[in-house]
């Protein structure tokens, strides 16, 4: 009987440890964006990557329904949100036009592709990145900007959503 009780306790401990590990597995909320110039197209390319769970939770919270990001109508909802929360501005303060190229979704991440057609990356003066910070107060977004052969990294969060690149 003692052996059986011991085994039950071990199994219960293992289950609880696993549940605790799963709960702690997603204790941070982060996104990463890469901005670079494509010499072949003459456009500045923007690639965002976010945790799929965070994007799904955001959309579900905003619209009180399930989202399927393989559905073009649901993609349009995400597009509208991202275009409101992320933008680039020129030296005169005007926003640079960002064209939505598309997105890729897998179990772990949502990758969003945008571009500023016929716009060199050195036209970017200001980056505004508030994606997910309105929903997740601890969201941290990192933007890597490659310009003139050098890489610069900028950090954004609920307290800092806009930075000059110079």
Where are these regions (language model features)?
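N-terminal signal peptide c-region/cleavage motif recognized by signal peptidases
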Residues: 18-20
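Bacterial N-terminal signal peptides that target proteins for export
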Residues: 1-14
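Intrinsically disordered, low-complexity peptide-like regions
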Residues: 7, 22-24
